[in-house]
């Protein structure tokens, strides 16, 4: 029996080692079982190419509903081109296509069809579903800016395809002599100029025997063109059983002519060929990180998270006839040369999504960084939340982190002068229409060293803490660029502004009034108010650049550890009076049974790694494995809160590898503990890094010892430049904590206070 089990185990390892198809472990439905009241990811199946301009998804929600696909739904209303980064931000430039039989129904309720997940195939590059109501199988395989649909119809004299250009301003034209439909949608949720349009072209391979257009719900047969609030079209034909009708679709934010250029991405490929190319594109990026020695659920969770990390920010540029990048500017409405990416919120993604790109996909991030320079040139500000232009959401000036971390890690924009100019501009201005862009409250902050609690600027303590870290990032770049000493010293001083909010009595961060007094009354369990989607227990740790300074404020490492431990020990009680209701982030904290630790939202996601700064890395190792095991799974309810455009997924990717970028802008990754027995990172420079932990297991999650390229290694961090050199990190795991490793002062990671 033992020999049999060993043989099965060995064979399974061989199968995994040979299967270089990493997409087989990706579940695009992970996190899709979400609602307004409780998020388990708030994702949808994004059928796309990595960072593709357009995603496609089956649509179960009503037109305009941010929850466009939910796993618990049982009807599909259409197949939608989407650019939605989050249900809270919603979509723009969306339109849909839907096969129907029997009657030419345009109404989304009447055309909807029952479906079952057993009849659904979802991969990153291909989607297939059986629509029971119409007896039609729908398949789709996208490129970056185009898609091929294949509809397999039953025998019917009345088979149709509905094209819905959505409401709030749209245009449609049926061109029967060319088997073509063209149109545009202007639908958006904000952040666009007045001339915004998404132009689309749809080409069919079967002549139409029926044609109609729709204006605001009114079906008009043999009318071929509509410009109205809500336009649509229906074309039809006779089909025999099993007949396949194809629809080739391309779109452009620039023009119909550019959409025609984008259609060339499909070439003459059939759907199998496009799916194969999509699979290859995904395997190329997923395969940059190979993990071995885990169980099937761990593989699925890891690669599903890596897939989510490689979707946003998406390309918002197109290629002209000469193959050069060109973009419609969502900031000034002009068509301009160069790169543009969008659909990301830096409040979320500065933390580890962009550091992951810097480490593993720097050439793509180089394009993103150039796009940020273009954003500043076109709007006067770097974005903080872009979808597709500036959106009023969240706090902080974290574009500084995204730009500086990239530059310091060798992902350098061509125009560093404009980069630095834009960073300085952002510290002294706020966007006149979008107050979350730039720095709201900057005059108070620059004068007092904090944004006051009592001057009617919401979430003021959160702003202060993030501005201080952002100033440290600018300080880092100013030093690198050898800026005048006075300038460097200014940002060094402002980087310490976090201290202005520390309350010695509670040993927590607390809102502070303009006259210098602290807010009163003060409840550390109160969500919102002075903080953003969290409370003081969550935000106190937002001193990414200076944990030692925070340790000193709390009275030393012992008290710091006690306060950290308390986050898990304090019951999941809360004060929701600021919101007047239990917001979903609160509920996600309470249901996870981990005290007041709220991993479902970003402010606290780095906190566990701070144990390393206080000389108790084994506590980080314990809690990290707890979070990975209890709060992630490759299932529709697989996240413990909003996935947030790759951030919560990238946290898992880094943590499963055994390190994490607590402070973007430094060259350090803080060591946790690997999840897999082996991981291999293939860098763009041609080097590979192997992380080998052969005795890793469910019970052996503590790091007993570590060596790097054969040399004993006790530090609690790894350096970026050393990782890129490749080599081997050997980790001996244990079921007992080693309380002697990583405890010496020289083992501690970077803190700004130590440099002063």
Model-derived features: positions:
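ATP-dependent phospho-/nucleotidyl transfer catalytic cores
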Residues: 470
